Amino acid sequence: MKYVNVIACTLLAGGLLVTAGCATTSSKVNLVVDKNQEARLVSTLDYLPAPKTDETGAFLPYEASPNPYLAQRGKIKQESIVKYIDAKRALKQKNYRHAEQLFKTLTEEDKNLSGPWIGLGDVAVEQKQYEQAIAHYVKAIELNSKNVNAYMRLAKTQRLQGNFLHAQNTYAKALALWPDFPEAHLNLAVLYDIYLNHPLRAQKHMEAYQFLTNGENKEVAKWLAEIQQRTGVPISLVVEKQKAQSKPLS
């Protein structure tokens, strides 16, 4: 399959932040997680970056919205941080039983932390226990509706189950929370292109990823060019627009 390295990296991108996960007062998030529940394609066009121009027509530098999860502040006990790091290390070493024990202990010692629930979900995914993983990720979102990592993990797991529209709905929730989430745009583009056969939607969100990351990923640039050849639609979010380049006045 084309660009397999990009797919492998991007579908994991939402979970690479090493954080124990703060707690917040969260409202109920309406997630479509039951695989037997019908899911319909929802529009995600409203979450695309919209560069602005000044009175001369010059593009202004784009100011991306901040990650709402990282903007949260909270105190986490030092011993919890150490235990969380140990759990992540055990997971990386495929010591799933030990990792699960540590994450479970963290959920019992501090019932407000969302991060350990993501960890439990990751353990379940590694063992292909997808339903259990989904339950853990949903719990993380219930505890902290701004934990963007949980949405990414949930969508990835739904994709692994073959529930592609459910995954699309979850990525839409992530972008509603943080419209300038680069990895959510890229993962959604992959989903649109490879699994849902919506190349134009894929192009728009892959453009968004390139725009928000200054076009640093050359593999994605090649993929985007290939999609654009298929759609025949010109690229609308040119990376150079972020540098306030002038456009001709009509």
Model-derived features: positions:
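Alpha-helical segment of the N-proximal tetratricopeptide repeat
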Residues: 73-109, 122, 126
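Canonical tetratricopeptide repeat
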Residues: 85, 119, 153, 187, ...
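Residue-level recognition of tetratricopeptide repeat
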Residues: 88, 122, 156, 190-191, ...
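Position-specific recognition of the canonical hydrophobic site in helix A of tetratricopeptide repeat
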Residues: 91, 118, 125, 159, ...
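Structural signature of tandem alpha-helical TPR/SEL1-like repeats
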Residues: 93-101, 126-139, 161-173, 197-205, ...
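Short coil turns that delineate tetratricopeptide repeat
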Residues: 111, 145, 179, 214-215
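TPR alpha-solenoid repeat register
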Residues: 116, 150, 184, 219-220
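Terminal, low-structured helical/coil segments at or just beyond the last alpha-helical repeat
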Residues: 194-250
